[in-house]
């Protein structure tokens, strides 16, 4: 079997693709893969480290206002379609899977015109412009949230989940917290503002930790940008560990009791696979406010609390955290509700979808 995967720009498009690739390798080790990304996307750093054959296209996104930039965007898109067709004819994949980002638009569209079976994976509750465009041309649409179903043709769509979930679903608590100077036996709150950090979250966490004196622990990944600043402001405390970044995030999540962070699709897939209660702070800077919709899918099922970015400060953060961390019954209820929202066999579902499409 030969599978071409395309998607990029952000980790939310890349990690689900890589998780699926890793799963297929366990099922069919002889499968050949190729990844096609954008020249300037994050995938340029991440994918080559996997050893997978990797090709890039020169492509960029649209701006909301009319501009010369958009004329160039159209030119690059048409050029990318031509380049994608060359790659596809050379590699001859049995199926092409797009996970979002502008590059997947060109590659999946090109594949559809060459009559190669195609699947797109939508990670969010509200689809992006690329997957909306591609939905008219692809054979199958894999959804991560039921809330995304109304945006796509029902006859093409299946609830699959996010393949990243299956990678973390079977993880148990480990001793990893000890590597951050914390007690693996104590209840722990993990606070994470995204790989780059988030100013509003950093300000609220700084206020919250200034007078922290609780029995539970806090592990905060601030992002490199804010690390030195918060280190100078927050007094040393045995129950608090501040790190610029956490490499083994999934393992740390599995060893935590509460997650505080943004409502990106990958984070939600991971925390629901683990049954981890959460306080979600949707980013106000994303397209179509999709993180709020992602968060609400858990809030309405009592699996998470939500604090709007403009309502976040040290006081609101402390109140939300202590409401959960001081109430064992609530914590257990939220954990169960979170687990019920998860799809821990997402990669298997995607694999079965791919096989059914190829054998059709």
UniProtKB/Swiss-Prot annotation:
Is NAD among this UniProt entry's keywords? no
Pfam families for the chain: Glyco_tran_28_C, Glyco_transf_28
Keyword line: Cell cycle, Cell division, Cell membrane, Cell shape, Cell wall biogenesis/degradation, Glycosyltransferase, Membrane, Peptidoglycan synthesis, Transferase
BP GO terms, sorted: carbohydrate metabolic process; cell division; cell wall organization; lipid glycosylation; peptidoglycan biosynthetic process; regulation of cell shape
The topology of this chain with respect to the membrane is: Peripheral membrane protein
GO molecular function terms listed in the Swiss-Prot or TrEMBL record? undecaprenyldiphospho-muramoylpentapeptide beta-N-acetylglucosaminyltransferase activity
The EC number of this protein is 2.4.1.227
Its GO CC terms? plasma membrane
| Catalyses which reaction(s) | Mur2Ac(oyl-L-Ala-gamma-D-Glu-L-Lys-D-Ala-D-Ala)-di-trans,octa-cis-undecaprenyl diphosphate + UDP-N-acetyl-alpha-D-glucosamine = beta-D-GlcNAc-(1->4)-Mur2Ac(oyl-L-Ala-gamma-D-Glu-L-Lys-D-Ala-D-Ala)-di-trans,octa-cis-undecaprenyl diphosphate + UDP + H(+)
Is Cell division included in the keywords of this UniProt record?
yes
**For binding UDP-N-acetyl-alpha-D-glucosamine, which residues are annotated in this chain's numbering?**
10-12, 124, 195, 246, 291
Q: Which InterPro entries match?
A: GlcNAc_MurG, Glyco_trans_28_C, GlycoTrans_28_N
Q: Which SUPFAM superfamilies match?
A: UDP-Glycosyltransferase/glycogen phosphorylase
Which pathway does it operate in?
Cell wall biogenesis; peptidoglycan biosynthesis
**Where located?**
Cell membrane
In the record, the note on similarity to other proteins reads: Belongs to the glycosyltransferase 28 family. MurG subfamily.
Instruction: Supply the PANTHER family for this chain.
Output: GLYCOSYLTRANSFERASE, UDP-N-ACETYLGLUCOSAMINE--N-ACETYLMURAMYL-(PENTAPEPTIDE) PYROPHOSPHORYL-UNDECAPRENOL N-ACETYLGLUCOSAMINE TRANSFERASE 1
Described function: Cell wall formation. Catalyzes the transfer of a GlcNAc subunit on undecaprenyl-pyrophosphoryl-MurNAc-pentapeptide (lipid intermediate I) to form undecaprenyl-pyrophosphoryl-MurNAc-(pentapeptide)GlcNAc (lipid intermediate II).
Supply the HAMAP family for this chain: MurG (MF_00033)
**Protein name per its UniProtKB record:** UDP-N-acetylglucosamine--N-acetylmuramyl-(pentapeptide) pyrophosphoryl-undecaprenol N-acetylglucosamine transferase
Organism per entry: Enterococcus hirae
* Gene name of the record: murG
């Amino acid at each position: 079997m030969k599978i071409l995967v395309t998607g990029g720009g952000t980790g939310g498009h890349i990690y689900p693709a890589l998780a699926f690739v890793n799963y297929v390798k366990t099922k069919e080790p002889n499968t050949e893969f190729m990844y096609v990304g954008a020249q300037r996307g994050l995938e340029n750093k991440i994918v080559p480290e996997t050893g997978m054959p990797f090709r890039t296209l020169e492509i960029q996104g649209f701006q909301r206002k009319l501009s010369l930039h958009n004329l160039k965007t159209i030119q690059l898109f048409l050029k990318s379609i031509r380049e994608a067709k060359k790659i596809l004819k050379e590699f001859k994949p049995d199926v092409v899977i797009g996970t979002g980002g502008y590059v997947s638009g060109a590659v999946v569209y090109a594949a559809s015109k060459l009559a190669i079976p195609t699947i797109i994976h939508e990670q969010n509750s509200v689809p992006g412009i690329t997957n909306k465009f591609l939905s008219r041309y692809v054979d199958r649409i894999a959804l991560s949230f039921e809330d995304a179903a109304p945006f796509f043709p029902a006859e093409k769509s299946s609830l699959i989940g996010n393949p990243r979930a299956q990678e973390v679903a079977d993880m148990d608590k480990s001793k990893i917290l000890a590597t951050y100077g914390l007690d693996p036996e104590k209840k722990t709150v993990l606070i994470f503002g995204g790989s780059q950090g988030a100013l509003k979250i950093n300000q609220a966490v700084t206020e919250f930790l200034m007078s922290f004196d609780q029995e539970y622990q806090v592990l905060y990944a601030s992002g490199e940008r804010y690390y030195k600043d918060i280190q100078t402001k927050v007094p040393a405390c045995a129950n608090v560990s501040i790190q610029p970044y956490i490499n083994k995030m999934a393992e740390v999540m599995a060893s935590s009791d509460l997650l505080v962070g943004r409502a990106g699709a990958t984070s939600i897939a991971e925390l629901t696979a683990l049954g981890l209660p959460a306080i979600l702070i949707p980013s106000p800077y994303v397209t179509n406010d999709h993180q709020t919709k992602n968060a609400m899918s858990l809030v309405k099922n009592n699996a998470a609390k939500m604090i709007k970015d403009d309502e976040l400060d040290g006081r609101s953060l402390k109140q939300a955290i202590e409401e959960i961390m001081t109430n064992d019954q609530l914590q257990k209820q939220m954990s169960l509700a979170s687990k019920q929202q998860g799809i821990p066999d997402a990669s298997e579902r995607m694999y079965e979808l791919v096989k059914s499409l190829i054998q059709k």
